[in-house]
């Protein structure tokens, strides 16, 4: 085993606290800082929100208009939101735009949007 391989093995055996202490000791010994330059972190930080937007996992179904068949839409709203009574479902449909469901998977959001659209509502998945 070479000298470098032995060193790698020994460093791999360090605990996190020991590795942090080693880092501090080396910074003092060599007169350097382990912190990344601020300018280098800027572009990476700007790219992160774009990636997060592409990886959206939670969606909201928004009822934008109740349509002409409000009774059917109210029935479907009560079907997807059993916690709502008749009055609350009616108020939600008549008060459009309103969020019907929030923080659901894409598949569930699309299923709910399809049901409401078939009932005569105009919906949007965000």
UniProtKB/Swiss-Prot annotation:
A matching Pfam family: Ribosomal_L12
An annotated GO cellular component: cytosolic large ribosomal subunit
UniProt-listed InterPro entries: Ribosomal_bL12, Ribosomal_bL12_C, Ribosomal_bL12_C/ClpS-like, Ribosomal_bL12_oligo, Ribosomal_bL12_oligo_N_sf
Keyword Ribosomal protein part of the UniProt annotation: yes
Keywords: Ribonucleoprotein, Ribosomal protein
GO MF annotations, alphabetized: mRNA binding; structural constituent of ribosome
GO biological process: translation
Gene3D superfamilies in the record: 3.30.1390.10, Single helix bin
Biological role stated in the UniProt entry: Forms part of the ribosomal stalk which helps the ribosome interact with GTP-bound translation factors. Is thus essential for accurate translation.
Family from the record: Belongs to the bacterial ribosomal protein bL12 family.
Description of how the protein assembles with itself and partners: Homodimer. Part of the ribosomal stalk of the 50S ribosomal subunit. Forms a multimeric L10(L12)X complex, where L10 forms an elongated spine to which 2 to 4 L12 dimers bind in a sequential fashion. Binds GTP-bound translation factors.
Protein known as: Large ribosomal subunit protein bL12
Organism: Caulobacter sp. (strain K31)
Lineage of the species this protein comes from: Bacteria, Pseudomonadati, Pseudomonadota, Alphaproteobacteria, Caulobacterales
Gene: rplL
């Amino acid at each position: 085993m070479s000298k470098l391989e032995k060193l790698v093995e020994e460093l791999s055996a360090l605990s996190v606290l020991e590795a942090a202490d080693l880092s501090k000791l080396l910074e003092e010994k060599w007169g350097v800082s382990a912190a990344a330059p601020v300018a280098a972190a800027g572009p990476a930080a700007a790219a992160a929100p774009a990636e997060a937007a592409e990886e959206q996992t939670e969606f909201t179904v928004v009822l934008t208009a109740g349509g002409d068949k409000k009774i059917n839409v109210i029935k479907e709203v009560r079907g997807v939101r059993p916690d709502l009574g008749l009055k609350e479902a009616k108020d939600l449909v008549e008060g459009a735009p309103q969020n019907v469901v929030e923080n659901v998977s894409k598949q569930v959001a699309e299923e709910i949007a399809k049901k409401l659209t078939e009932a005569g509502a105009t919906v949007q998945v965000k």
